[in-house]
Regions:
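N-terminal beta1-alpha1 ligand-phosphate binding loop
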Residues: 2-24, 184-186
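Beta-strand-turn-beta hairpins that frame and shape the catalytic cleft
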Residues: 139, 173-178
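An anion/phosphate-binding loop that grips the pyrophosphate of nucleotide cofactors and donors
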Residues: 38
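Acyltransferase
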Residues: 180-205
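Pocket-forming structural segment of enzyme catalytic cores
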Residues: 88-164
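Cysteine-nucleophile active-site neighborhood
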Residues: 47-119
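Short, surface-exposed beta-strand/loop micro-motifs that present aromatic residues
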Residues: 167-173
Length: 205
């Protein structure tokens, strides 16, 4: 069972639907016991960084997320879910992130000919043998919707990058914690394969 953390953000049902498509059972929940008893946990979301942190704290889900990560349970952050795992964001200055991973969320720089938010398909450059990308081609195309991007403090945790106005850390992996700026649930067959790879973690070890 995969728990999808419900903190009032959008996009929860599309993640649930994608997991169903690959044959995985999931539950959308904010209940601590259901989350801690799940085999794996996903933190999805679209919206504003500060509002999301307020919601996580309101439901005490910030504490639950730290518990999950400390348990070495596989954890996946998607889009805003990636951003929340880091220290803070230009979008909501003065608001502390979850500090699960080290790095900052920065605004995508303005560049002539490019629209912000970045909405659409971009290819990834894979690196560091990320487990989410096992069996994928070298430059898979995935779907992005964002105005802010990750600059991780440690390049060793970065498993995929892309270019849009600047160099973007698009996916990271550290121990049991995985995160991607793009939306695997909206990324067609490549995205479903990424979710399959996440679902298989621990089953084949």
């Amino acid at each position: 069972m995969i728990a999808i953390i419900d903190y009032g953000a959008g996009n929860l049902r599309s993640v649930e639907k994608a997991l169903t498509a690959i044959g995985e059972e999931s539950i959308v929940t904010r209940d601590r016991h259901e989350i801690l008893n799940a085999d794996k946990v996903i933190l999805p979301g679209v919206g504003a960084f500060g509002d999301a942190m307020d919601s996580l704290k309101k439901y005490e889900l910030d504490k639950v997320i730290h518990e999950v990560c400390d348990m070495s349970k596989p954890f996946l952050g998607i889009c805003l879910g990636l951003q929340l795992l880091f220290e803070g964001s230009d979008e909501s200055q003065g608001v502390e992130g979850l500090h699960v991973l080290d790095g900052q969320i920065l605004r995508i720089p303005d560049k002539e000919g490019l629209k912000i938010p970045h909405i659409g398909w971009n290819s990834l450059d894979l690196q560091n043998n990320g487990r989410l990308f096992k069996g994928l081609s070298e430059h898979p195309y995935v779907y992005f919707v964002h105005s802010y991007y990750l600059k991780a403090a440690d390049e060793a945790i970065v498993t995929a990058t892309t270019e849009y106005s600047t160099h973007i850390h698009a996916s990271v992996e550290k121990n049991n914690v995985f995160a991607c700026q793009f939306h695997p649930e909206k990324s067609s067959r490549y995205g479903l394969k990424i979710l399959e790879n996440f679902a298989k973690i621990g089953r084949e070890d």
